[in-house]
Design a protein with these regions (language model features):
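ABC ATPase nucleotide-binding domains
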Residues: 259-281, 286-295, 311, 532-549
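ABC ATP-binding cassette signature C-motif
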Residues: 1-261, 312, 316-549
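ABC transporter TMD-NBD coupling linker
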Residues: 293-311, 355
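Hydrophobic stripe of amphipathic alpha-helices that form coiled-coil interfaces
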Residues: 102, 109, 134, 141, ...
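Short, flexible active-site-proximal loops enriched in glycine and acidic residues
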Residues: 155, 268, 305-308
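Short amphipathic coiled-coil heptad-repeat segments
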Residues: 144-150, 275-279, 295-300
């Protein structure tokens, strides 16, 4: 369906990838994998036609519809949420208008035998066949389903898009793309602004309804669930695996071991050849052999080994000062903004050493309750922090508190103590600040995502006994998430984490607080047991509704 031939991208004297080729077929479910900076997003932009390669080409049939969701979106205001999502069908209205226009032209023309008249008839017939094959009778229902599935409430439908944050606007754009039912769907980090329920809905939709999908995502569970093919971008090349992400990791390890074996054998041969040349270069009887070996080395294609992931670092928190037995106790806590009730009558007891998750749809009060704990906003009820509680707090706006005049290295060097001081560069590399140039950048030139990662590292090095993390994984790759998760498992204090990343929460938390319908409900289980319970509750709810009907 889409053919990529000899694609090369160069800029600033650097080759991002060279002479890569692959095919995207109908119903393919492809995950693009590789380190940050390997060129995944660039490749997606080229497939979408919004960027041109240095060399090579991307070809597709004329009627192939490609839809692209970038990481960062420029949105326009002026419509309601429902109207904007309905723009997914604008091309069909344009098609209908074009059919009417061409039929009108046919009605007025009299050159029935001309080639152009016959061509117009054929064009009308082809477009009409395509148009009437599409069921337009349920489009409003489809828009409603997509918006509800992605977390909107019915009362949101008539609100202007300008009322919503960038994350919610991204959901509107995602709904539009899904409703278009394109031949190829290109998604760059689609789960970044979604909650767990919306991610699950998106998974179900992509599996059951989408055609070909190419996705970049750091959400391991999402990628595993929806993809059956993995294309890795590494060192300017691609490797194509006909398996999902988890199986790809196994095959990649085997391939790298094979590469390393071949590399070592080649290096041994090269050294032996160089030794021969050095030993006999002045010996007349060996002149031809020496010259032959010199030419062989000049023509030899060196075996390269894929980049080793150097971020296999074990991060350890400083020892936690001992807190009281109950770091957080809430009785009847609630929060309202005017007539809008976020949640009411929340009763929580978090014990020392607990690792708990706050989950639920966006806007149900997870971050609001965190702000109550941090005493950033007032609230109803009683909220008590235990004896000697020392809080480490990470939120998306923590990055704005960094000293902009310090370098990345200085920012961490100022807080690092003990043996970790000898591993600052390893630590920075693990959080995607690899190399001297990256570590010597001033904070003021960093992107938002880079600042967020730096704020995270800084927090992890401070001695605290209650760690509160609000969406800590949004700007982390899979390896960095693994390092953070292991560090949190080893953390001997108390943890509250707000996250939509199921794989990250799995095995980390043993208690889940669910936010929804103005309530906070406690579940004494891990994330997957909680999700299974929710699934059963949803099925029972459907059965009850079915019984009433």
């Amino acid at each position: 369906m889409i053919s990529v031939d000899g694609l090369t991208v160069e800029f600033g004297g650097t080759t991002l990838f060279s002479d890569i080729s692959f095919q995207i077929n109908e119903k393919d479910r492809i995950a693009l994998m590789g380190k940050n900076g390997a060129g995944k997003s660039t490749l997606l932009k080229i497939l979408a036609g919004v960027r041109q390669p240095t060399r090579g080409k991307v070809t597709a049939p004329k009627d192939c519809v490609v839809a692209y969701l970038p990481q960062h979106l420029m949105t326009e205001d002026g419509r309601t949420v429902f109207e904007e999502a309905s723009q997914a069908f604008a091309h069909l209205r344009e098609m209908e208008a074009e059919i009417e226009r061409m039929n009108g032209e046919l009605a007025t023309r009299t050159d029935y035998e001309s080639d152009s008249y016959m061509e117009l008839i054929e064009k009308v017939a082809a477009m009409s066949e395509k148009f009437y094959a599409i069921d337009m009778t349920h489009f409003e229902e489809d828009v409603e389903k997509a918006l509800l599935g992605l977390g909107f409430q019915r009362e949101d439908f008539d609100r202007p898009t300008s009322d919503f944050s960038g994350g919610w606007r991204m959901r509107i754009e995602l709904a539009k793309l899904l409703l278009q039912n394109p031949d190829v769907l290109l998604l760059d980090e689609p789960t970044n602004h979604l909650d767990i329920e919306s991610i699950q809905w998106l998974e179900d939709f992509l599996i059951s309804s989408a055609k070909a999908v190419v996705v970049i995502s750091h959400d391991r569970k999402f990628v595993d669930n929806i993809t059956t093919r993995t294309i890795e971008v590494t060192m300017g090349r691609i490797y194509d695996y006909k398996v999902n992400y988890s199986q790809y990791l196994v095959l990649r390890k085997e391939r790298r071991e094979q590469q390393m074996k071949q590399y070592e054998e080649q290096q041994k041969m090269i050294q032996e050849t160089k030794d021969f040349i050095e030993r006999f270069k002045g010996t007349y009887s060996k002149t031809l052999q020496v010259q032959s070996r010199v030419k062989m080395l000049e023509k030899l294609e060196l075996i390269e080994v894929d980049e080793e992931d150097t971020s296999a670092l074990r991060l350890k928190f400083p020892p936690s000062p001992r807190s009281g037995s109950y770091p957080v106790i809430m009785e009847g806590v609630g929060k309202s903004y005017g007539d809008h009730v976020v949640f009411r009558n929340a009763n929580l007891t978090i014990e020392r050493g607990d690792k708990v998750a706050f989950v639920g749809k966006n806007g149900e009060g997870k971050s609001t309750l965190v702000k109550c704990i941090m005493n950033e906003i007032d609230h109803e009820g009683t909220l008590t922090l235990g004896h000697n509680v020392q809080i480490g707090y990470f939120a998306q706006n923590q990055a704005s508190l960094l000293d902009e005049n310090l370098t990345v290295f200085q920012t961490i060097d100022d807080v690092a103590k003990g043996e970790i001081r000898n591993k600052i560069r390893d630590l920075l590399g693990a959080f995607m600040f690899g190399g001297p140039e990256e570590s010597m950048k001033k904070v003021k030139v960093l992107s938002g995502g880079e600042r967020t990662r730096l704020a995270m590292i800084k927090l992890l090095l401070e001695p605290v006994n209650l760690l509160i993390l609000d969406e800590p994984t949004n700007h982390l790759d899979m390896k960095t998430k693994d390092i953070l998760k292991q560090a949190l498992l080893d953390f001997d204090g108390t943890l509250i984490v707000v996250s939509h990343d199921r794989d990250f929460l799995d095995g980390l938390v043993t208690k889940v607080y669910e936010f929804g319908n103005q309530r906070v409900k406690e579940h004494l289980c891990g994330i997957y047991e909680f999700l299974e319970t929710k699934k059963m509750e949803s099925l029972r709810e459907l059965e009850r509704k079915g019984g009433k009907a």
